[in-house]
């Protein structure tokens, strides 16, 4: 978005929002409200859309789903009127992520596809890459592997055109990781080692910490399925050594969920509980029912495997209660 037509005060507010929206919620809300108050007086759809979008983003970061939905709805109406396609696409991407986290894949898919419609009106590919990666991940969860590969390879071709900066390397790591997982889950193991070699050779040094953990989770699955148990255990040791570092693992929750299922399969009980004990307080803080259900389902599998009947029954009861809550949340999301 360009703001050259506005006075210095408004441009200052806008810059404060852009500088602080990912690190200072209070300041971001203050300047967004200043922008909205000014825009209300001047009936400026562009500024109203901008202000409400970044307030919605703050609510998303704070995991206030209800406030996010109410605010992003206001943002979308103004952004549409102003023709600000990039923020509309970003809004639909966040809506898709929230729906996906809540376990409603069809609604998430609709949001992502709506976002891609607006991406076609943009010359910058970054938002389209993000949404196509998310579509690939969603289709992997839904076991629609052909569709997943289509989205991921489209994202790969777009990412190859970007400047070779840190963002480029992060996209490439994420895309290759998801392609590898997609192939392994289909039993297509040939060539997957080459994908991981490319990640380590071309992108590893510039990758973010969480990107690396995600890749290690994928490598663990690959080495287990290919019978390379020594290499599998090396990856497990790397991940286990980082579990207690107070890192925001919620960003790779689905990777860690699949990883925990694998730990159960290969009797890595200590490492399994290290992950669970790290994730549990974060999941409670986020208060996302679908994540709580997934965590409880892992415990149920563990208790059943080890014949811990009392713990199994208690966890099963909690799972039932959470399932009922998710049904209500799904109805509310649809309505």
Descriptions of predicted regions:
Residues 33-40, 73-83, 113-124, 153-164, ...:
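Amphipathic alpha-helical segments of tetratricopeptide repeats
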Residues 11, 50, 70, 90-91, ...:
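Residue register of alpha-helical TPR repeats
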Residues 7-8, 46, 86, 126, ...:
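Residue signature of alpha-solenoid helical repeat architecture, marking inter-repeat boundaries
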């Amino acid at each position: 978005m360009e703001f050259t037509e506005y006075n210095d005060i408004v441009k200052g507010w806008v810059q404060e929002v852009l500088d602080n929206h990912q690190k200072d919620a209070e300041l971001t809300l203050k300047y967004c409200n200043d922008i909205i108050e000014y825009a209300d007086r001047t009936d400026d759809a562009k500024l109203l859309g901008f202000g409400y979008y970044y307030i919605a983003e703050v609510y998303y970061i704070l995991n206030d789903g209800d406030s996010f939905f109410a605010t992003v709805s206001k943002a979308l109406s103004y952004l549409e009127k102003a023709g600000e396609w990039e923020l509309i696409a970003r809004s639909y991407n966040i809506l898709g992520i929230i729906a996906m986290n809540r376990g409603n894949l069809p609604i998430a898919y609709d949001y992502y596809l709506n976002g891609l419609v607006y991406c076609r009106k943009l010359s910058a590919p970054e938002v389209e890459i993000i949404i196509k990666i998310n579509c690939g991940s969603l289709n992997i969860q839904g076991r629609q592997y052909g569709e997943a590969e289509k989205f991921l390879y489209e994202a790969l071709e777009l990412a190859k055109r970007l400047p070779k900066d840190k963002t480029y390397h992060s996209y490439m790591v994420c895309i290759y990781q998801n392609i590898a997982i997609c192939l392994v889950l289909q039993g297509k193991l040939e060539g997957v080692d080459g994908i991981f070699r490319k990640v380590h050779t071309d992108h590893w040094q510039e990758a973010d910490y969480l990107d690396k953990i995600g890749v290690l989770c994928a490598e663990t699955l690959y080495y287990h399925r290919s019978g390379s148990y020594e290499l599998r255990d090396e990856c497990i040791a790397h991940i286990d050594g980082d579990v207690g570092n107070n890192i925001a693992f919620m960003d790779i929750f689905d990777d860690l969920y699949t990883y925990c299922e694998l730990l159960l399969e290969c009797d890595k009980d200590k490492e399994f509980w290290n992950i669970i004990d790290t994730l549990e307080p974060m999941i409670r803080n986020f208060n996302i029912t679908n994540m709580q259900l997934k965590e409880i389902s892992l415990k149920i599998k563990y208790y059943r495997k080890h014949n811990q009947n009392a713990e199994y029954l208690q966890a099963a009861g909690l799972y039932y209660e959470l399932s009922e809550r998710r049904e209500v949340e799904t109805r509310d999301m649809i309505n």
